[in-house]
Every structure is written in C-alpha cells, then in structure tokens.
Amino acid sequence: MKYDFTSIIDRHGKDAIAVDGLVPGGHGPQPPKEGFDIIPMWVADMNFPTVPTITQAIAQRIQHPFFGYFATSDDYYNAIIHWQEQRNGVTGLTKECIGYENGVLGGVISALNVLCSKGDNVLLHSPTYIGFTGCLTNNGYHIVHSPLVKDEAGIYRMDFADMEKKIVENSIHATVFCSPHNPCGRVWERWELEKAMELFQKHDVMVVCDEIWSDIILEGHKHIPMQSISEDARQRTVALYAPSKTFNLAGLIGSYHIIYNKALRDRVDKESSLSHYNSLNVLSMHALVGAYTQEGSDWVDELRQTITGNVDYACGFIAQHFPGVKVQKPQGTYMLFLDCTEWCEAHGKTIDQVQQAGWDVGVAWQDGRAFHGPCHIRMNLALPLSRVQEAFDRLQKYVFVD
C-alpha cells in the first residue's frame, strides 16, 4: 500500500479522548491491570494517520499569518461537488444546495426544528446511534423506535410493516435515517431505500438522513445516496455529510448538508444561522479541500481495503473462538456490534462483567446498551491489524473463556 495503515502511533498527550479521556471520572473505568496497555476500540475515530494532503493544506494556509473573518471559497464547494460525483455518482449538485454545519448532529436538530414542533414524535431505527438519542431528547423531541430485524442470513433489515404502524399510530412526519447504519454497519440496498421512501411519501414523512459514514463502505458493497432514489426523495430529504469520519477530522469540526428543495433549504439555513454559532473554521475549510482530492480518494480506497481486512479477521476470529457471541459482519463503517446474549447465558455472566473483563486487560470497548443493544458491545476496528489481533488474543485468553 502507498499509505500507512500499519504504524502504531502513540496518541497519548495529544488531546485525543480515545486515549487521554480514559481516566476515572472521564470516559472509562479504572485503568487496565498492570502489564496491559490500552487498545482504543470505543469512540468512533481512527488510529491511522490521515492523508498527507490534509496536513499539507493546513500547513500551507498557516504560513499566511492572518486568521480573521473570511468567506467560504469556491474551492470548498467545488471539492464537495466533485467528491460527491466521483464517490457517490451524484449529478446536478450546485453550490447553492450545500450548507455548512458544525456537526451532523447539529444539522439534524436544525432540520428537525424546521420540520417539527417540540414534543413531536420522530421515527428512528433501533439499535440507535447514541448521538441521536441524546440530541433529540435534549431538544424536546420524542423518539419512536422501529427495531431492525434479522433475516434468515442474520442480516439486519428494516421492518416496513412496523415502520408504517409506528408512523400512523404516532402521527409521525419526520424520521432520522442512518445510512450506512451505525452501529449495525448495514449498507442499505436500493430496493430497501426505495421501499422506505415509498412509505415516507405515502404518509408525508420528511427525512433527515445522516450519511457521514458513506465513504467507509467495505469491499463488495456500494453506498446509494438517499436523495438519488427518486425525485420525491430528492425534495423530501435533508442529507448530512462530513469529511470528519472518513479522514479522522472530528477535532477540526466541519460538516455540511445537501438540500435540493429550495424552500426547505432556506428554512434550514436560517435555523442553522440563528445563534451565529454555526460558522465554518478557516482551517476546516482548507482541510476539506485537501481531503476531497484524487489523493484523498486513493487514500480512502486503501482505508476501505484495510478496514475490510480487519473486519474479516475479527469476524472470523469470533466465529472460531467465541461460541455464543453473535455479530453481523458489517458492510460499512469500522464498527462491530457484538451480541453477547447467548455467551452470557451459557456462562452465567452479565454484560457488565464481560465489559469490565475487557477493560481490565486494556481492550477499551463500548457499552452497547447506549445503542439499544441490551447485551451488546460496540467495537472500533480502525486500528492497525496488529493491534486488532492483540485485542482479540486478550479477549480469548482473559474474557471469553470457559
């Protein structure tokens, strides 16, 4: 490979919550037992150095020693338009349809504030991304869950009958849709998106679609933008994207929405700007321009190969060595969602005991209950393969033991 996905780089002391936040009273329990270092497999950021064109773009801008008020450049909009066309096959996108958001979750709330009244019911699938739960609840919206169901092959699917029942019974007119799905890793097929949009059109449900993971699609799968499904979907959907998940730029802040419906776009733009808080950072702008290049695209292709290899290794190891631990092999994202129900029942353990046993040996994974997985654990695989292998060796020796 041209790019570095194998080096183990110490992130301690560099402000990364993935490692520096794991202190008592912070994001983790007690430190691991003596002799075990921390393998960060919880929060969804990556342990790979980002593509060099990003650091080069930022370094070049820093050479100009002025950081005052600025205007968003055409380079920024053109980079997004080109990226969406190259990676997702999007055509007809213009700069007028693109709007800055500090974060995807902030964009979700700006859209819902336009589409709903406080106290309204909003449809979400479960398992559910923890960020949706917090921001919707904190902003006065009531979440109605439609659980995903597993088919005969163990693949999570939407339950369209349940979705329609929940929409009708709860007078729902807005949904927050996750594509690809976090934490389950589903990359929705076109027929699934078409059927969902038919349902939303039938019952006049507006769609806020989080597509932040859309670049991290594993080999053999393809992301389909929700707005590409039909002209109605194009007009009904607020789509949210960011380079942050793709290139590990969460610390720089910077997302964007794509809205084709002018009346809706004007209202969301106004809502997003009311507090004067939602404004682009000049270095984030240059980071996106540096990311959305041909070199950035090449880097993402190698990242996808790396994550696919890590997923293949982890799922194969689980199937061979952890009987009773169930996992649907993700089709996108770099997260695993482990169902430990059968293993815990067979061994007389609680999910708390399993999680603590992992933390004790430095496997810093995440409680799946916050994602509506009652006996689940979420694991980040965006690490060098050697670290993934070390983590699963520890789990075999010290956690999932008879």
Spans of model-derived segments:
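N-terminal small-domain helix-loop-helix segment of the aminotransferase-like
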Residues: 2-103, 110, 294, 402
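Conserved core of the PLP fold type I
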Residues: 67-199, 215-216, 221-232
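Short strand-turn motif at the edge of the Rossmann-like AdoMet-binding core
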Residues: 211-213, 242-243
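PLP-dependent aminotransferase class I/II
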Residues: 236-320, 326-330
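PLP-dependent enzyme catalytic core of the Aspartate aminotransferase-like
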Residues: 346-350, 356-366, 370-402
